[in-house]
Swiss-Prot record:
InterPro entries: DNA_glyclase/AP_lyase_DNA-bd (IPR015886), DNA_glyclase_Znf_dom_DNA_BS (IPR015887), Formamido-pyr_DNA_Glyclase (IPR020629), FPG_cat (IPR012319), MutM-like_N-ter (IPR035937), Ribosomal_uS13-like_H2TH (IPR010979), Znf_DNA_glyclase/AP_lyase (IPR000214), Znf_FPG/IleRS (IPR010663). GO terms for biological process: base-excision repair. HAMAP family: Fapy_DNA_glycosyl (MF_00103). This is Formamidopyrimidine-DNA glycosylase. GO terms for molecular function: 8-oxo-7,8-dihydroguanine DNA N-glycosylase activity; class I DNA-(apurinic or apyrimidinic site) endonuclease activity; damaged DNA binding; zinc ion binding. Involved in base excision repair of DNA damaged by oxidation or by mutagenic agents. Acts as a DNA glycosylase that recognizes and removes damaged bases. Has a preference for oxidized purines, such as 7,8-dihydro-8-oxoguanine (8-oxoG). Has AP (apurinic/apyrimidinic) lyase activity and introduces nicks in the DNA strand. Cleaves the DNA backbone by beta-delta elimination to generate a single-strand break at the site of the removed base with both 3'- and 5'-phosphates. It comes from Lactobacillus acidophilus (strain ATCC 700396 / NCK56 / N2 / NCFM).
Length: 276
């Protein structure tokens, strides 16, 4: 699943491709992708101009004229690509926005898990899935003290807590494994048993890792591509994710893999301390 750095990279690469274009028509090849009323989606969008793209956590917010916004969640394998109206349709293209210049933005999704909805701009924090999200890394709301205080209330393993988007928004399996390894914290550690000093280090590692991953244009380990069809670069910097059975570069012990609430989790059993 694209995590926050990947979605931010999609936003940055998609914006110059479509900003200023006017929608002429919309085609729904697989209507289920649109979670709101299909007829309204098809009726309201023609004539609307793309004025910008924002992002919150893993959600793209495509801003339109007349105070409308398309909220788009890529889920597991959603992608956008710009083509022309007459270009052959890929079997996994499910939604098409045809512009007045006859270019077309297509949403492609092998798994068909992604969703879009049309809302009034400014109401995105009322959208199911967004309204309960916690703060993003590298924001004033995600302070060191916030994370320390939040973890004190959680008697769950730290991996689950960090994947819970109500604690911190935008993290997924890759960056949680990486930041826990950087912080020398075992993924099965109970959140409220981790010393405050270690939580402070975790907070710093989360912020630094997400910032660097955005700088490197995200991580491609499966199918992620940006809006230009290019892979990310952070996969070359992964220290633990995807390295099960290899030596830990810090201590030389062998990385192991376990399941934590159904999620594959790679860690070093020697230098990642378990707090219980």
């Amino acid at each position: 699943m694209p995590e926050m750095p990947e979605v931010e990279t999609v936003r940055r690469t998609l914006l110059p491709l479509i900003k200023g274009k006017t929608i002429e028509k919309v085609v729904l090849w697989y209507p289920t992708i649109v979670a709101t009323d299909h007829d309204e989606f098809l009726k309201e969008l023609p004539g609307k101009k793309i004025i910008g793209i924002d992002r919150y956590a893993k959600y793209l917010l495509i801003r339109l004229s007349d105070n409308l916004t398309i909220v788009s969640h890529l889920r597991m394998e959603g992608k956008y690509h710009l083509t022309t109206e007459d270009a052959p349709k890929d079997k996994h293209d499910h939604v098409e926005f045809v512009f007045t210049d006859k270019t077309a933005l297509r949403y492609n999704d092998v798994r068909k898990f992604g969703r879009m909805q049309l809302i009034i701009t400014g109401t995105e924090r009322q959208v199911t899935g967004i309204k309960k999200l916690g703060p993003e890394p590298n924001t004033s709301e995600f302070s060191q003290q916030y994370l320390i205080d939040n973890l004190k209330k959680k008697h769950k393993n730290i991996k689950n807590v960090l994947l819970d988007q109500t604690t911190v928004a935008g993290l997924g399996n890759i960056y949680v494994d990486e930041t826990l390894w950087q912080s020398k914290i075992h993924p099965l550690s109970i959140a409220n048993k981790i010393p405050a000093k270690k939580v402070a280090g975790l907070w710093e590692n989360i912020n630094q890792t997400i910032a660097l991953a955005i700088e490197k244009r995200g991580t491609t380990v499966h199918s992620y591509l940006d809006a230009n069809g290019e892979v990310g670069g952070y996969q070359e910097m992964l220290q633990v994710y995807g390295h099960v059975g290899e030596e830990c570069p810090r201590c030389g012990n062998i990385f192991e893999k376990i399941k934590v609430s159904g999620r594959g989790t790679t860690f070093c059993p020697h230098c990642q301390v378990i707090y219980k």
